[in-house]
Structures are given as C-alpha cells and as structure tokens.
C-alpha cells in the first residue's frame, strides 16, 4: 500500500487535522487518573453540545465502530417484552432492523424508498394500530444516499403515543445543529470519527438519565451493556469496563477543542453546507446530477447519478485516487450512484480541486 496522504471525501472515517493526528503520538494508561478525568471532561462537553438541559442527560462511551453503539442501545434499552418500530430508507435503518432481529427483539418496520424521507403518515398509522410498540428508532442522516430524515416529527409522534425515542445521529451530530431535549430524544447515538472530526475507535450515546436508569439488567450482551458501562463511568470517575481506545479518546478531545475554535456546531454546519452546495453546482457543470431533491439533502454526503452508458465508478475512483482524492461507491439498490462526502477537514478549495480534476478530463474524458 502506498504511503500517500489522501483527502477522504467520505462520511467517516474522514480527513482529520494534523493536530488531531499528532496527539496520538503519546501513550496513555487506562487506569490513570489524568486519563479518566479527560474521559469525564469529554462526557461533559458532549452533553453540552447535545442540549441546553444538561442536568437531564448523560453520555456513555462504547468501544468499537458506531454500529457497536447502535447495537448497545438496541440490546440494552428494550425490555424482553418490548417492541421496536424502525423507520427505514437506507442501509443503516435496515441495520437496526437486523440488529433487533438477531437479538430476538420484536421489530416492525416503516419502509420508505431510499431517495424519500420517512413517511410520517405511515409511522403514525403503525403507532395507532400497534399498541405493543414500546420504542421507535430513526436514522437522522442516512448516508446510504445523504438524505436527512425528519427526526423532530418522528420523535414528536413517538412521544404523542408514549414511546421511547432512539435516534441514530451517527453522521449528523456535531455537524447539524440539534437539541436532544427540544427534539424529545431519549437515546441519541453517534461516533468519534464523524462530524466531530476525530478518528475511529469508539461511539457514544447521549441518554436521558431517567430512561437509562430503567435499563439495568436488560442487556442481551456483556460487553455491549449500556447501563453497566454508564454505571461504571459514573461511579469510577470515567473508567471504562474493558480496555478503552486511549489514543482515539485523546484525539477526540483535541477534535472537540477544534470544533469549539471553529465556532461550534453552527459554524461547522455552515462550512459543510457551503462545501455541499459548491460541490453540487460544480458537478452539474461537468455533467453529474444529484440523486436527491434539494429539500431532503444533508450537508454531509451527496449521491450523484451515473452520467450515462460507459461510465464506471471504479475508473472514477482509481483516477481520482491517483490525484489524491478518495470518494465512496453508491449503496442503493435500484439506481446507479456514487457518493462524495464533504465533512472532515475539507474546505471549498478542496471541492474546487476535486471537480477541476473531473472537468480537465481526468475521470470521464
């Protein structure tokens, strides 16, 4: 493998700053007081990012990819007699269904086409008809396409019918403004290597304390027991139950500081949104149309339709990689697409350089 530095135009892992990388040059002990106090500081900062009503929420870390944290929530918060409604319009909603099925959790699905947002009328109809449902889950930014789902409306419906609300905000938290209390979210899940601009290694859950406190003994896994992980962090000053990804944690703290220096989530969202708008404008100029209606498009990642016969993604990928850019293949089943992300340490000038490569004939000639 060539030792090149590529600009990752992906939804995470993503391009990080030099300073985030540099803090990983030092080693940390998982039992060290200074390290555990750093964990506590990060937990506090995340709650502050998530809501103004900080006293009602807490943060739990979970080792592994973001999916580990999703599975931790699904497997730990739904009781044996519970039933989950999942709103799906992409691979990550489907993954929640798969997790629930694997864990033998009773699950029902509200399916929408991958290029359309959650169907609120159908969600309400299901909630009206099925009183056994106890929990409802939705993906905020479904990076299968880049679509933003109406989490405020989904959670409002959930609470209207007395359900516990779960939001997979893996690819939106830190890059899209939100307040979990205002949105009536009970459990929100995200990851270190997304909009906060850290590196892979752990995910985190912003949880409403009163809901999390009810989850003792519900977990269907030892290592993914969300309640036990939280209780240990609370009672032992930030200690993880099992070996934590120390370098990733330290890098994440640096990334949080840099988010603050940038001007917070609002400023980062402005940069991401500008990146995305410039990307679409420039790509249209060279013959590529976006998949989604602008009203549903996130500022995180954009799906583009294949321009015509003879186009192959692999050629696009390899030739862009030779010029220092890494993009994503498509992930939907019914339409040929590829995806370009614009989060991470990425700026408008990078977007122009990318599309300049395409317009100069590097990719499609």
From Swiss-Prot:
GO biological process, one term: organic phosphonate catabolic process
PANTHER family: 2-AMINOETHYLPHOSPHONATE--PYRUVATE TRANSAMINASE (PTHR42778:SF1)
Subunit composition and interactions: Homodimer.
Reactions catalysed according to its record: (2-aminoethyl)phosphonate + pyruvate = phosphonoacetaldehyde + L-alanine
InterPro entries, sorted: Aminotrans_V_dom (IPR000192), NH2EtPonate_pyrv_transaminase (IPR012703), PyrdxlP-dep_Trfase (IPR015424), PyrdxlP-dep_Trfase_major (IPR015421), PyrdxlP-dep_Trfase_small (IPR015422), SP_NH2Trfase/AEP_transaminase (IPR024169)
Family: Belongs to the class-V pyridoxal-phosphate-dependent aminotransferase family. PhnW subfamily.
Name by which UniProt lists this protein: 2-aminoethylphosphonate--pyruvate transaminase
């Amino acid at each position: 493998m060539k030792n090149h530095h590529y600009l990752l135009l992906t939804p995470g892992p993503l391009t990080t700053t030099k300073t985030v990388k540099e803090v990983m040059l030092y080693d940390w002990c998982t039992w060290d007081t200074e390290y555990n106090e750093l964990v506590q500081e990060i937990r506090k900062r995340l709650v502050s990012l998530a809501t103004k009503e900080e006293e009602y929420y807490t943060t739990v870390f979970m080792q592994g990819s973001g999916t580990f944290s999703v599975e931790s929530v699904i497997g730990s918060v739904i009781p044996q007699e519970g039933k989950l409604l999942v709103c799906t319009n992409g691979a990550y909603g489907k993954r929640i269904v798969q997790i629930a099925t694997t864990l033998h959790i009773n699950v029902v699905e509200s399916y929408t086409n991958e290029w359309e947002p959650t169907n609120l009328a159908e969600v309400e109809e299901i909630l009206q008809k099925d009183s056994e449902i106890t929990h409802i889950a939705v993906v905020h930014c479904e990076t299968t396409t880049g679509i933003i789902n109406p989490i405020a409306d989904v959670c409002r419906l959930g609470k209207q019918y007395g359900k516990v609300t779960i939001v997979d905000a893996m690819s939106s938290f830190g890059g899209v403004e939100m307040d979990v209390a205002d949105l009536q979210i009970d459990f929100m899940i995200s990851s270190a290597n997304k909009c906060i601009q850290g590196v892979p290694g752990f995910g985190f859950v912003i949880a409403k304390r009163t809901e999390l406190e009810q989850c003792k003994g519900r977990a269907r896994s030892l290592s993914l027991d969300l309640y036990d992980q939280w209780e240990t962090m609370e009672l032992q000053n930030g200690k993880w139950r099992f070996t934590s990804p120390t370098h990733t944690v330290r890098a994440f703290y640096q990334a949080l500081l840099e988010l603050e220096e940038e001007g917070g989530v609002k400023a980062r969202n402005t940069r991401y949104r500008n990146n995305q708008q410039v990307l679409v404008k420039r790509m249209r100029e060279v013959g590529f149309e976006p998949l989604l209606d602008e009203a549903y498009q996130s500022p995180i990642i954009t799906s583009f339709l294949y321009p015509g016969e003879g186009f192959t993604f692999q050629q696009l990928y390899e030739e862009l990689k030779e010029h220092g850019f890494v993009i994503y293949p498509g992930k939907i089943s019914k339409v040929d697409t590829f995806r370009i992300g614009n989060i991470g340490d990425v700026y408008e000038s990078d977007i122009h350089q990318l599309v300049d490569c395409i317009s100069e004939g590097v990719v499609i000639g």
